[in-house]
Amino acid sequence: PVAGIQNGVFTVPIVGSAVWIEFEQGDPDYPIWTGCFYGSAAEVPAAALIVPPGVPGITLQTPLQNSLTISDVPGPTGGILMKTTTGAMVSVSDTGIVISNGKGAIINMVGPSTDINASALTVI
């Protein structure tokens, strides 16, 4: 959808993905990949399901579940959520910023306060 010199969106569907193909001027020697679709609801990225139906959102997710979700859900569940396969995450929302390494270390920034590892250190 976007391409330019040293910028753009680059994705390649994995083998077995459902894709739409068109042919330039109907010539089968010139296929054009024009899009993808989900064959069933089970194929929708899990990260996309955190955005309620009817709320604008964008989800990027790899087959191993690394994801980036941007949504207009108000409050702590909206905003931007970046997660890795191992559970590390960064959440930026109207209520604050949370950074977690997925192994117990958490930095929580809400208002003027910063809390590290469940109040092991709090800076106000």
Task: Give short role names for the model-derived ranges.
Residues 1-110, 124:
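Hydrophobic packing positions characteristic
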Residues 119-123:
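Short, low-complexity, Pro/Ser/Thr/Gly-rich segments in the mature regions of secreted, periplasmic
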